[in-house]
Amino acid sequence: MCVFKPHLAVFDAQGQASESKAGDSEVYQREMYEPSGRLRSLLRLEPLRMIVYLTLLAIQSRTLDAGDWPMWRKDELRSAVTDEVLPETLSLLWRRDLPALTPAYRNARLHFDRGYEPVVLEKRLFVASSHNDSLTAMDTETGKVLWRLYAGGPIRFAPVVGDGKVWFGSDDGVVYCVNASDGKVLWTLRAVPSKRMLLGNGRLISVWPIRGGPVLRDGRLYFAAGVWSFEGVFVYCVEAESGKVIWRNDRAGYIYGKHPHNAEAFGGLTPQGYLVINGDDLIVPCGSALPATFDLKSGRLNDFSLPAPGRDPGGWFASVLRSEDGQNLRRGTLTLDSEVNQDRHEDRQIKNTGTPGARNSVRIQDKTIRFADGFRNVKGTIHSMLAADGKAFVVTLDGSIHCFGDSTAEPAIYERKKYEISKPESLPDGLKQALDHSGRNGFTAIVGNPSSPFLESFAGHTELHVLAFHTDETQCGKIRGQLDDLDLYGTRISVLHGDGSNLPPYIARLIYWTDGSPDQEACKTLFRSVRPYGGRLCFTAKNRPGINLGDLPGAELRHAAGFVSIVRAGALPGATDYLGDWAKSRDALVKAPLGVLWFDDTVGLFKRSPQPRILNGVMASHKKRWIEDFDKRAGGKDYRLTPAIYTDVYTGTVLGESDTEDVRKVLPKPDLEEVQPSQYRPPSQIDHWAPDAPQPGTRVNPLNGKEEPRRFPKSYGCDGGFDYGNLFTMRSGTAAFYDKTQESGTINISGPRSGCTNSVIPANGVLNIPYFYEGCTCSYPLPTALALVSMPQTFEQWASW
């Protein structure tokens, strides 16, 4: 029986829901979340209507000053329309070159953070950055930096400004309110259940990043936290002045309903995109799916559904066209952008409905300006444009902000500084030896209040991303600024407030304790985060207390030049490798409940690629040449393979040759010229496209105590599933698994698409779910790779049984 108390939705043989409760938790009926058609009724997307509506948008909302641009695309409708009066002759006043931003995802349907999105309040321009986790205020007249503030993670969405304040959210799970004049923090709200962290898009962030971009109306700020529905998502309304919570919806993560191809499974919101207010509706974009609609006043979920037919690509962008009569300034027609909501299916490019180019244009007075047409003498691809304070601001994808206004003076040009990497100061021999044994790709952590000079020197000796922990929050800000001045912050080094105790498990190739020697409890806590297969916890031998290795499974003690290393030399006890060929993988560490360890879409695989092999903490994957070989596919044969890509199963990091030598010697090398089969199926699956229902043995029914065949809900998925021994994994609408050791029921990992090939594999102590999405356009809301790790039994996880 599942001792971790999952919420259960019980189904009969026909898949019909019946009432059930787990503990005292209320079970909401499916009817509450059936698509109401409200969202569909809002989507009137004809391009001709857009032209008609845009002519009406010169009248601004009563709540906004025409001289400001207080939020992304001007207002809560995200209309990108202003009646700002610009000089007849526009001259370049200044240009500031910032680092180009790297979006969180490769997939353009999730490019909500591809470039800078400034906002303007009075004489100040504010720009957020995911490059160095900062919010910067600039003088609109001169382009000079007035102040800069650093958050605890990337800031991926534009701030909101008004009433002398700036509001923004970060991937650290915190919403900030600061003084617009000097950046002083007025209040913060940790909008998430705990300080638990994971690796998300290559950075250490909260499990619940703020990726529902904030929007403001009538003194209330709305935003959303969390991107994994099965981890919990939270949609908020707070008082802008104080941060006091007015309402919070935390029930939108576990919704049993339709998925692509009419599958039924647990799913829910994946808030990624800018929130929109349309009359009494709060629109919450959901990544590469379609948006959800909430009641603005109460926070009740009114509508959310995934496109059931499949092949209907959604995306992050949503905005509103105002009513045809121009009188209702707060309600209009929700519009999407068909250039955002498109993707390459295996056989063709597929576009969903929407207004082409809606995201890439603004309207100033009676003139629509399309970014593709260029602006003045701006070089590069225009990403964003706005008008405020009698000026036009143009932002390019390469990171340059241009300000145009009325002036004959020579423009001020602030070029990005080019930093010479100086030879780093030497490290102590014992620490240098430990670092030399820690590999080149991945993460290292430094705990114990390191200084900026030490971090600069340390980073000069390694290619690993450095995670530095400092217990003094004020010092964190200072060190971030000092490292940013050296162009090291964010991309090479992250400074986090804390003692390192909330580091995720297994991610660090080296953890260095700078403050003497850790006690037994600290060793135990930090050792959990040390990577298997050679990772180490390192500290000075001076005044070292006795270390009980019995508390540290698999640990070995090593000494070098005055330093001690506790090394996790081999595999995790109980973990298994998976070498393919449909062998069992009874990994004793992979058991329900499971939570996200990392997610990233750097490596994308074709949907019918072969299973990866997993050995010594490394996943070896082969893509198919589906684009290059498309015209050659015939007779049940498919495409050729590309060379193997090697990734770290504990971080998702792509690994080079020096970190994978042992694996390359062992794993087979397929013939890259051989045409591959269309499908890869286990011997138990006879029909490639219509698998039989899973029947992996018998069980004792936890509801009635009787022995019976082990059956459980499995919805659509040409992957019929595979019994790895302890876990049966499959695609059941989403990636899913059934833990046989606990009779867990079917647990959906909602968000990504698992492969046509079974690609949900327990091995090396984690549940591996590589990205098997290329060639598919269905609206799975979060197409990415991820790994999951076992969580405490108190962790909430819903299942269908």
Feature locations, PLM:
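A short glycine-rich, Lys/Arg-flanked "PGG" loop and its adjoining helix->strand segment in the class I
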Residues: 520-535
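Beta-propeller blade signature
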Residues: 8-11, 183, 233-244, 293-299, ...
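Conserved SAM-binding motif I beta-strand of class I
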Residues: 465-470
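A short acidic, Gly/Pro-enriched loop at the edge of an enzyme's catalytic core
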Residues: 501-510
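A short beta-strand motif characteristic of beta-propeller blades
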Residues: 94, 100-107, 144-149, 187, ...
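Repeat-blade elements of multi-bladed beta-propeller folds
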Residues: 1-3, 69-73, 109-135, 149-176, ...
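Extracellular/periplasmic ectodomains of large secreted or surface enzymes and adhesion receptors
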Residues: 1-58, 64-110, 191, 251-252, ...
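Conserved SAM-binding strand-loop segment of SAM-dependent methyltransferases
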Residues: 487-499
